[in-house]
Regions:
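Single conserved hydrophobic/aromatic residue that forms the stacking wall/gate
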Residues: 1-6, 10-11
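Glycine-centered hinge/linker elements that transmit conformational signals in sensory
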Residues: 12-40, 71
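Short helix-loop capping/hinge motifs at secondary-structure junctions, enriched
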Residues: 20, 30-33, 101-108, 180
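Conserved C-terminal helix/tail region of periplasmic/extracytoplasmic solute-binding proteins
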Residues: 32, 153-206
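Conserved hydrophobic residue
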Residues: 36, 56, 186-187
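Short helix-initiation/N-cap motifs at beta->coil->alpha
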Residues: 38-52
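Paired acidic/hydrophobic, glycine-rich loop segments that form the ligand-binding mouth/hinge
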Residues: 57-62
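C-terminal lobe and pocket-closing loops
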Residues: 63-74, 83-176
Length: 206
């Protein structure tokens, strides 16, 4: 899988590499040992329910988890654990998009540029949004929402999903592969080899 355009990940095939196989094997081991809860398979308790009931020690969640102030009294945000010196998460949230068929491209581009100015980014941060530019992050006052600092630090090493129209299908392929391994229907190598072949076909059509 040639993924994550614009990052170091785009220069190598990595989906079914030995490192990825080892990583998935580790996740499967954690799941079988009960280190990872049933939420990974869409079962109960889910992430929020599990951690609030004391079933889970940690969850991976966005800043919206702390929308209720009392959560900061109970939970502490932290960076994604580092592997080989890299702490990587996926960039999610909202997108600003200008479609290729738009009849107002100039106006759309002007509006996008306006939204990405530091002044607007900082203003939106006051409403709970995390700035999407490094320059705006440096100007945000997080005294009323200290958890935001951790998320902004994590964004420095975050990676975006691949920019392609086939992403929803690719996500389904990946989810199916991971689930088959967690259920014991395939080995990590078998599932990832099959997924890589399917995804390469999809990417070839882009």
């Amino acid at each position: 899988l040639r993924s994550l355009v614009g990052s170091e990940m785009c220069i190598r095939d990595s989906l079914n590499s030995q490192a990825t196989v080892n990583a998935l094997d580790t996740i499967v081991g954690w799941y079988r040992d009960g280190v990872i809860g049933p939420a990974i398979m869409g079962e109960q308790p889910d992430g929020w329910g599990g951690i609030e009931a004391g079933n889970y020690a940690m969850i991976v969640e966005g800043p919206w988890f702390f929308s209720s102030e009392d959560k900061l009294d109970t939970y502490t945000p932290a960076l994604i654990p580092s592997v080989d010196g890299r702490s990587i998460s996926i960039v999610g949230g909202e997108d600003i998009v200008m479609t290729s068929t738009s009849s107002k491209k100039d106006a759309a581009w002007t509006f996008i540029q306006f939204l990405l100015q530091d002044e607007q980014q900082v203003a939106m941060a006051g409403a709970g949004m995390i700035p999407v530019t490094a320059s705006a992050m440096e100007k945000v006052d997080t005294s009323n929402a200290p958890y935001v600092d951790v998320y902004m630090q994590q964004l420095k090493t975050a990676q975006a999903r691949i920019p392609c129209s086939s992403w929803p299908t690719i996500e389904t392929v990946l989810n199916t592969a991971f689930e088959s391994v967690l259920r014991g229907d395939a080995t990590s190598q078998e599932a990832l080899d099959a997924a890589a072949a399917q995804i390469d076909e999809l990417l070839a059509k882009e």
